Amino acid sequence: MTIALGRFTKEEKDLFDIMDDWLRRDRFVFVGWSGLLLFPCAYFALGGWFTGTTFVTSWYTHGLASSYLEGCNFLTAAVSTPANSLAHSLLLLWGPEAQGDFTRWCQLGGLWTFVALHGAFGLIGFMLRQFELARSVQLRPYNAIAFSAPIAVFVSVFLIYPLGQSGWFFAPSFGVAAIFRFILFFQGFHNWTLNPFHMMGVAGVLGAALLCAIHGATVENTLFEDGDGANTFRAFNPTQAEETYSMVTANRFWSQIFGVAFSNKRWLHFFMLFVPVTGLWMSALGVVGLALNLRAYDFVSQEIRAAEDPEFETFYTKNLLLNEGIRAWMAAQDQPHENLIFPEEVLPRGNAL
């Protein structure tokens, strides 16, 4: 029996090879296989958002004006969620709600599901792009892993939370003031700021900002003065092999300041990755819990004592009263489909009235 040793080579390139060559070619803007998902989805998500904020009203879904055409500005314009009566319908243009009528589709809130779903897949495509490029240049995939954190937050807030509620209506609309409204809603109806997952998210984001500031300042403080350029950016060759700052000096400085310091760069930079990513993951988990209407801390003993003793009040019981005010005000204004009517004496009054 004869055994032939050698490498198998194709005589001709098939369609996959041709596409792979073109997609992964070295060009100014890398496309890649991930680009087949990223670029169309990002284009449609951004296009839908610009279209909605420019032309489309929220009168039929929220009883609001929400477009530049109606007089809104960048901070008040939004692509609003569909009405609560449409529940979790995907609101396809050709579906039973719009029946192929583009104007009716926009009026019903179809642009929101369009932007939300294309936006989610666009973010996933961007993460896959980082995986693909890292693999191409033989890097580890920590950039993509880090980017999974904002994806988790987006998916939990815009998709999982409304799926746990009665409809897309309770998701945030895509706009600046609309997001603020959603934050107030979360506080009033879920007491979100007292949720430990929210606390971990805040600690992660603010802790990451602190770490970035400390790290950047420390590197700037310990730069070697071995270049004759006019400033930091001209003094060093970007391809030089040697380091441009002293880790030993930085370690000694922070050891004197805090008594402890990072001993090597790997642990330092992993910690800078770990803090914000873990914080965002935890906050995403908390939002999933809110989708199921899970409650966080309830200090019942303080509530009972405050109810029995008018002179006893804590910041916790005060916040509960504020939350009641938010609910009383927002329920009628924010959910017009419920036709809620509250007596005047229970509604908060302000200078705007």
UniProtKB/Swiss-Prot annotation:
Listed InterPro entries: D1/D2 (IPR055266), Photo_II_D1/D2_sf (IPR036854), Photo_RC_L/M (IPR000484), Photo_RC_L/M_CS (IPR055265), PSII_PsbD/D2 (IPR005868)
Any one GO CC term of the record: photosystem II
List of residues binding pheophytin a: Q130, N143
Origin superkingdom: Eukaryota
This protein's record includes keyword Signal: no
HAMAP family listed in its UniProt record: PSII_PsbD_D2
Identification of the protein by name: Photosystem II D2 protein
Taxonomic path: Eukaryota, Viridiplantae, Streptophyta, Embryophyta, Tracheophyta
